């Protein structure tokens, strides 16, 4: 729990891997940021209040607990469901209305034979804000490349559709290109998220 002026911030971490959970606790202690750590499967029902922001870096693969995936909108009718689809749904379910999700996902997430189900969920439940491809130099190959997907949970009379910000984040070693990207992002923010 952290107090920022008149707001209290709670940090929660959900990690199924016990080693990564312990590393996260040590990192939080080092940074002096208090975290509640839940060493559990993030696709199972969560014991948390709705959040203003969810940040996630999702594993790619199949989720083996078919009983749980069948309870979810992004679960497949047959066979194992994609864990990254289920984690997107879980992230949105964990948000308050108008809350934001910042999710690291495979860059090719909007391709494949099951993508219509994901697209329907995103358009029904959220306002997509941005899809930012991370620099290719961060990954061994194009197949491993990831992107940042930014979604806002819909809330009647609060959220509104925006022009989705699509961009390739330039290599961090090129300051001029990176500054150009930041300028573009700021312009998009000014146009689509003006303070009232």
Positions of PLM-derived features:
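Local beta-strand N-terminus motif with an aromatic residue
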Residues: 50-52, 128, 146
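Mobile active-site "lid"/loop adjacent to the S-adenosyl-L-methionine
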Residues: 57-87, 108
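Conserved nucleotide-binding/hydrolysis micro-motifs of P-loop NTPases
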Residues: 59-62, 108-110, 138, 155-156, ...
